[in-house]
Design a protein with these regions (language model features):
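Active-site and channel-lining beta-strand-loop segments
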Residues: 221, 245-255, 332-344
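Bacterial N-terminal signal peptides
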Residues: 9-22
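A mid-sequence, solvent-exposed acidic-amphipathic segment
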Residues: 197-237
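Aromatic-rich beta-strand edge motifs centered on tyrosine
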Residues: 123-125, 197-199, 219-224, 241-253, ...
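A short glycine-rich beta-turn/N-cap micro-motif
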Residues: 103-106, 203-204, 225-230, 249-264
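PEST-like low-complexity, intrinsically disordered acidic/proline/serine-rich tracts
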Residues: 30-58, 62-75, 80-190, 194, ...
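Signal peptide processing junction and immediate N-terminal pro/mature segment
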Residues: 20-31
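N-terminal secretory signal peptides that target proteins for export/translocation
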Residues: 1-6
């Protein structure tokens, strides 16, 4: 499962360059943002907590984008070695760990042999719930698999997750009440929140609480390269010690992103080895990992206190915003503009770019552990997979468990599999919100710009009837944008779409759909903002309807806003494992 997702970004970059050369003024797009401030750089001899936490995440390759946010939201690793089964070591033939840090979730699948006997297990934790599965995703689809609740295993599994090579610095930042070290105060000293720093034998030692495990305290000792060589967690009468070494980028050679992970890992409980692993491969680029909790597990588990929310940076917490310039402030006291028939008038130009991308301001500088041939421009392309908005948020579509690996595989081969890379439209709802709207009493027209969802796609348009007509059951034509009809529910415009083809994705990350997809979009204008809500149903591939994170479109007063260049031609070239497209 490996593919250089960044390779396709070269084509996307061409599109951006061409778009920048299109005959649009800066004011037409709301103006460009000011240059980013110089990045925080600790002094070489800095020994305060801010410097140590920053160096920890920086040296591990966890900082992404020109703003250097910590953006490792999910990962997988595979390994070999031994695990303890019934108190005795068992030689692994399979070990696969899938982690979602945003939801405090981890699924570990292993198979091992001892004395001619095969053992296997699927161990899962998600927030305050723990269980074992007989098949991956047991009970998420009714009648498929068996989930066995194990409430007594929650604490040990959360400790393993948050003491892991990437989990430990995240937990330390969580304890410091700041998800980005470079945002800590300069005078923080050796303490911030519940996270403390000491120096022992010339090495930084960071102490922090384990999220979700009251009373559990971790002590991480970092080496000269600011990577954890040991993390010791004390919780009641149990001491769990994790030893790490041989840090490297273990991703496939086709998708090196220079995020480091430990190659050697040993776990001991009260001095006894329980797991000894050698990493064979990682996938650190925000891979699709979901850990939904079966209803039977929730019913069997008593949760006495709310589980702590894992802090996320503002980029992740804010699901909408203008890419270019500052959005207009909502005129809350201004009367609602209405048409002659009394409907809210949505005619106008709208800042509809959604997301915060590294190429807003420029390229990320090379980090201290990156290869000698690193360039900021190269970082821009590798960071793309971390910053594409549909890939880093916790609100991902929940696919049927048997399709989870397919989503990952499509993601790995995005540049060949993503339909937009072969010149096809983004489709609905991936196209995002419209840049310009024309409204009449009978229909509404949307004009879309290009570059949505991290740089892909072309300008497109939709003309949608809003006269309460129903879908034509005789129209069997499938379309990229579907067959859409609209009606008003009070002051909300509701668009109902069916009749899609299966040649678009819901977003970057392999989020495919079937031709049975049904999409409902809602547009509600208040002042000079439009709330854009989307619900996607696709029982062929999804476990449940996907309710997309609401977005806001903000009015742009410039008369040139919403102008888009003509949809260009597109040519596709096959380059071994890379599909390259040139727009002109």
């Amino acid at each position: 499962m490996a593919f250089p997702r960044w390779a396709g970004l070269l084509a996307a970059s061409v599109a951006l360059v061409l778009a920048a050369n299109a005959p649009l003024t800066a004011s037409a797009q709301g103006g460009f943002p000011p240059p980013a401030p110089p990045p925080y750089t600790p002094a070489a001899d800095a020994k305060d907590l801010k410097a140590v936490l920053f160096n920890w995440t920086w040296h591990m390759g966890m900082l992404r984008g020109i703003d250097e946010h910590e953006l490792i939201v999910s990962l997988e690793y595979q390994g070999k070695g031994t695990v303890q089964v019934d108190g005795q070591p068992c030689a692994l033939t399979k070990y696969r760990a899938s982690i979602n840090y945003q939801t405090s979730g981890e699924r570990i699948q292993y198979t091992c042999n001892r004395a001619g006997k095969t053992y296997s297990a699927i161990e899962v934790v998600s927030g305050p719930y723990a269980w074992n599965e007989d098949v991956v995703g047991a009970e998420i689809v009714k009648g498929k698999g068996k989930a066995t609740p194990l409430p007594g295993a929650v604490e040990a599994r959360l400790i393993r997750l948050w003491a892991s090579p990437q989990g430990a610095p995240k937990a330390a930042l969580q304890g410091a009440k700041q998800p980005d070290a470079n945002k800590l105060a300069d005078d923080v000293g050796n303490s911030a929140g519940d996270t403390k720093l000491a120096w022992e034998g010339g090495k930084p030692v960071v102490t922090f609480p384990i999220p979700g495990v009251p009373g559990a305290t971790a002590t991480a000792t970092l080496n000269a390269k600011y990577m954890a060589e040991s993390v010791v967690v004390r919780h009641g009468s149990t001491t769990t010690e994790f030893s790490y070494g041989d840090y490297n980028d273990w991703n496939s050679s086709l998708n090196k992103v220079e995020v480091l992970y430990a190659g050697k890992m040993t776990e001991k409980q009260n001095g006894k080895v329980v797991r000894e692993l050698t990493t064979t491969e990682t996938e650190t680029g925000s891979v699709y990992v979901v850990v939904p909790v079966p209803a039977s597990v929730k019913a069997a588990t008593k949760v006495s206190a709310p589980f702590p929310a894992i802090a996320t940076i503002p980029v992740l917490a804010n699901p909408f915003g203008a890419l270019f310039g500052q959005p207009a402030q909502p005129a809350k006291d201004e009367p609602m503009p209405r048409t002659a028939d009394g409907k809210p008038d949505m005619t106008g130009n709208w800042n509809s770019f959604v997301g915060f991308f590294n190429w807003r301001y420029g390229n990320r500088r090379c980090g201290p552990t990156q290869s000698s041939d690193c360039t900021p421009a190269w970082n821009q392309t590798t960071d793309f997979e971390f910053e594409a908005p549909s890939r880093f948020g916790p609100n991902r579509p929940l696919y049927k468990p048997e399709l989870w690996d397919k989503v990952q595989q499509l993601d790995m081969w995005t540049n060949k599999e993503d339909p937009v890379m072969t010149c096809q439209p983004l489709g609905v709802p991936r196209q995002g919100g419209p840049s310009r709207i024309f409204q009449t009493a009978r229909d509404i027209t949307f004009i879309y710009g290009g570059g949505f969802d991290g740089g892909g796609g072309y300008p497109e348009y939709r003309i949608i009837p809003t006269d309460n007509r129903q879908h034509d059951p005789k129209d069997l034509t499938t379309r990229y944008m579907g067959q859409t009809v609209g009606h008003w529910e009070g002051d909300t415009l509701v668009l109902d779409s069916v009749g899609f083809n299966d040649q678009t994705w819901l977003g970057r990350g392999g989020f495919f759909h079937s031709d049975q997809m049904h999409v409902v979009e809602k547009f509600t204008r208040k002042g000079n903002e439009i709330l854009y809500e989307v619900t996607v149903e696709d029982p062929e591939v999804l476990v449940e309807p996907w309710v997309m994170t609401p977005r806001k479109l903000t009015a742009n007063p410039s008369p040139d806003a919403g102008l888009v260049a003509e949809r260009g031609n597109c040519e596709v070239y096959e380059l071994t494992n890379i599909t390259s497209q040139i727009r002109h």
